[in-house]
Amino acid sequence: MKMVYLGLFLIITSCVISSGNLIYECRWVDTIRVKDPTNELCQKKCEETFTGRITVKHGYASSERRCACYGEKVLETPYPSDGVKDCNRI
């Protein structure tokens, strides 16, 4: 019977300890300056530049000569940096 209690204690303790590591999913926005932005060029530049981030999407404004890149990024800390905004714990 003592072994059962010891086993339950170890399982509960490991669950509490592992729940201390929180992961956050954050939305981010960043821009890249280009000479003559097009939809295809912006898609290529966004995917090349931000390979470490997930769900990279893109848009462009030809008047500003910039490609806008946005998507989601998984972080261990929810601190805003690198254009990161709106973090939610996952």
Curated annotation (Swiss-Prot):
- Where does the entry say this protein is expressed, by tissue? Expressed by the venom gland.
Q: What range does the record give for the signal peptide? A: 1-18
Gene Ontology MF annotations: toxin activity
PTM note says: Contains 3 disulfide bonds.
Q: Which domain of life is it from?
A: Eukaryota
Q: Which UniProt keywords apply?
A: Disulfide bond, Secreted, Signal, Toxin
> What is a single cellular component term in the Gene Ontology annotation?
extracellular region
| Primary localization | secreted
Q: Which family does it belong to?
A: Belongs to the scoloptoxin-15 family.
The name this protein carries in UniProt is U-scoloptoxin(15)-Sa3a
Q: Which organism is it from?
A: Scolopendra alternans
